């Protein structure tokens, strides 16, 4: 498992991480990640959801920097969809299957850091990170990451994509 300073060493900082699990196996995996992650974030909470998941998702989107869903991707997509704003505002959303084999960067791969968190968590679990952004697949620098690194702001993300 990565050392505690591994998160900061990768340029990742976390203000608030939330884990959401729907099953006992999901909760166990969430606990494993929590123990490995330990003191790497200033705040962390875990939520076990049996019902009313839709009601909980909206406040989680507003208050979390990183959301870890321990469930099927389809569940996470359906829960997140109504609250998605844009890539500059959404939290990093990752999906970890109950079996712990894959860590999927689902939302905010670049600016939210989900791609880097996926690699980091995958190391913890000896899992496969799943990254689908084109720049990462091509091993290219992403303009939004480059801008963030140098303290620059992109005024119009639509123009930046051209």
Regions found by a protein language model. Give the residues of each.
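Short, acidic/small-residue loops that bind anionic groups at enzyme active sites
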Residues: 84-109, 116-132
């Amino acid at each position: 498992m990565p050392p505690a300073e591994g998160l900061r060493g990768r340029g990742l900082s976390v203000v608030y991480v939330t884990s959401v699990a729907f099953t006992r196996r999901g909760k166990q995996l969430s606990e494993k990640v929590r123990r490995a992650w330990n003191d790497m974030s200033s705040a962390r909470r875990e939520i076990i959801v049996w019902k009313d998941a839709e009601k909980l998702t909206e406040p989680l989107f507003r208050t979390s920097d990183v959301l870890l869903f321990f469930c099927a991707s389809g569940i996470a997509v359906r829960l997140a969809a109504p609250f998605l704003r844009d890539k500059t505002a959404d939290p990093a959303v990752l999906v970890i299957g109950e079996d712990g084999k894959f860590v999927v960067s689902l939302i905010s791969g670049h600016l939210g850091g989900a791609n880097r968190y996926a690699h980091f968590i995958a190391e913890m679990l000896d899992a496969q990170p799943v990254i689908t952004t084109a720049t990462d697949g091509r091993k290219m620098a992403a303009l939004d990451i480059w801008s963030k690194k140098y303290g620059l702001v992109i005024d119009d993300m639509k123009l930046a994509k051209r």
